[in-house]
């Protein structure tokens, strides 16, 4: 990663003995020593507005749009230019990303390979993807030591007065979509929309749906407020809610 100007790494639920050995090895890159270690993918991508999954499509029928690697950089550039943050997600070498992992991805990037030998090891896949991005995004988009799409504190202060209009344009972060998904799931259960046995399937399908809708932060707040209100009414019933305004907002 560091070879291509990328400086922010998050590692999700690593196998501790191997991870500890890698970080403590003589000559271990600063990148590894500064990496975030998180228990779940949802936390790792919470601040990101575009999450890109990686893997070999093969005979699978992908549930997200598939973008060839050479066409990825313009999408990343557009997201950065409008103030978003981008994450690329790589799965474990043995099994790749699971279906559950992919539910947090907006799109899937495919590396062009020989159909007779489509698989690449993890290190190769990371290097090829980051090289392709670095070769097309050289300059301000890949500032050394700076997280992609990060807004500094001084810039944020200067934009305070325009935060509402900015949220109306900025894509909803993965964390915002997760909050919407959680309250919608609760409302579905409270309304007996589907049995609890279907919860795992609903969990997956709902996250894919929210990403296909390409919501803004403003959209996500409104939907969150709406479903919180619906859930409040469902949980309390007509008799308890009369004369009370109930919760509002996001």
Label every PLM stretch briefly.
Residues 2-250:
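Post-transcriptional modification and biogenesis factors for structured RNAs
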């Amino acid at each position: 990663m560091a070879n291509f100007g990328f400086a922010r790494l998050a590692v999700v639920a690593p196998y501790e003995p191997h991870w500890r050995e890698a970080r403590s090895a003589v000559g271990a890159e600063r990148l590894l020593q500064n990496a975030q270690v998180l228990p779940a993918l949802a936390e790792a991508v919470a601040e990101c507005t575009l999450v890109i999954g990686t893997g070999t499509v093969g005979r699978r029928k992908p549930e997200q749009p598939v973008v060839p690697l050479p066409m990825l950089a313009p999408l990343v550039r557009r997201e950065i230019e409008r103030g978003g943050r981008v994450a690329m997600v790589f799965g474990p070498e043995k099994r790749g990303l699971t279906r559950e992992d992919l539910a947090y991805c907006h799109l899937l990037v495919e590396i062009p390979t020989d159909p007779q030998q489509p698989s690449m090891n993890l290190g190769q896949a990371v290097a090829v993807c980051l090289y392709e991005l670095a070769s097309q995004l050289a300059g301000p988009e890949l500032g050394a030591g700076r997280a992609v799409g990060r807004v500094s504190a001084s810039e944020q202060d200067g934009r305070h007065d325009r935060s509402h209009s900015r949220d109306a344009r900025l894509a909803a972060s993965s964390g915002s979509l997760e909050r919407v998904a959680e309250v919608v799931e609760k409302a579905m259960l409270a309304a007996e929309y589907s049995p609890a046995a279907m919860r795992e399937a609903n969990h997956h399908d709902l996250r894919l749906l929210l990403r296909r809708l390409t919501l803004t932060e403003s959209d996500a707040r409104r939907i969150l407020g709406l479903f919180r209100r619906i859930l409040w009414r469902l949980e309390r019933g007509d008799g308890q809610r009369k004369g009370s305004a109930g919760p509002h907002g996001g």
